[in-house]
Amino acid sequence: VNDVTAEAELFVHPALFYRNQSEYLAVNVPFIRAGLDAGEPVAVAVPRENLELLRGELGEDGAPVRFIDMQQAGRNPGRIIPRVLRAFADAHPGAHVRIIGEPVWFGRSAEEYPACVQHEALINHAFTGRRVTIVCPYDTARLAPQVLVDARATHPVVVADGEHLPSGSYAPDHVIASYNQPLSRPSGVPVFSFSFDAALLPDARHFVIEHAVALGLGDGRRDDLTLAVAELTTNSVVHGGGTGVIRIWAEDEHLVWQVEDGGHIGDPLAGRCPPPPDRPGGRGLLLVHYVSDLVRTHTRPGGTTTRCYLRR
């Protein structure tokens, strides 16, 4: 990784395959130290177990490093690019930036995983032309084989067993498309639905809040829900054909709700990257990602479904 980084003028995005803590430290610690020695900004955004592992290994030398608990900051994979990666890189314009980002860990749910894979694929577009190196570790001892297949498809370089080699299966756009699948229907639980147009936007919001309270959403999340519902329903009216349907139900520890409309999201980075400061609008879906614990989307010509999860 260090050799790749030293020669890099622009974006580098390797996957690191590791089997144990020793292999994890053997690559990541020299990568961090090389960045610090070069005066480069370094961030580490990984699950808390690995965060503490790296923090302990670096000791006082790690003081300049920005440590981020990915299980909190990246709980929703859709906000990792804007809130974690871009936020750090944009804070250091002109510098070569190093980031260790581990968005996929053992224990990610089946609902979260497709959003993780799309996130990894989208990084390659979000940082085109930027002087950034983002190393993404993958625990080969615990993650499913398909996860490693997807990692090879979303990273142009794979670091394993001390070597860094081009990935022969690198195809991020194919990954983005292949994980854009219809969302599974809820089963075995009551689902409440409401159809809306511009005149019924206030009623749609009231409908969701009323059912969310009945389904056990805590007071601390109601403002998040209100904001997200307002953004998505307004987006349906303005960009999604003028009408939509909102559905809400409870699923395990989550409140789940979704908006269906006749629009089509043509840019897969929509909601994943902050728009330029001088561009009016374009922040609605971004805000939805910020306040939700998970956002899943299926979009096609003539219809889009956006599903949001909030812990109750």
Predicted regions span which residues?
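Non-catalytic regulatory/interaction regions at protein termini and inter-domain linkers
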Residues: V1-V191, S195, P202, L217-G220
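Amphipathic coiled-coil/heptad-repeat helices and related helical stalk/stem segments
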Residues: N28, H119, V229, G281-G284
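Amphipathic alpha-helical segments that form the core helices of the histone-fold
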Residues: R33, V229-T233
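Hydrophobic pocket-lining residues that define ligand/cofactor binding sites across diverse proteins
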Residues: G35, A212, S236
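Conserved beta-strand-loop-beta-strand hairpin that lines the nucleotide-binding pocket
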Residues: A121, P182-R185, T234-R312
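Conserved short strand/loop->alpha-helix "switch" segment adjacent to the catalytic nucleotide/phosphoryl-transfer site
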Residues: P202-A230
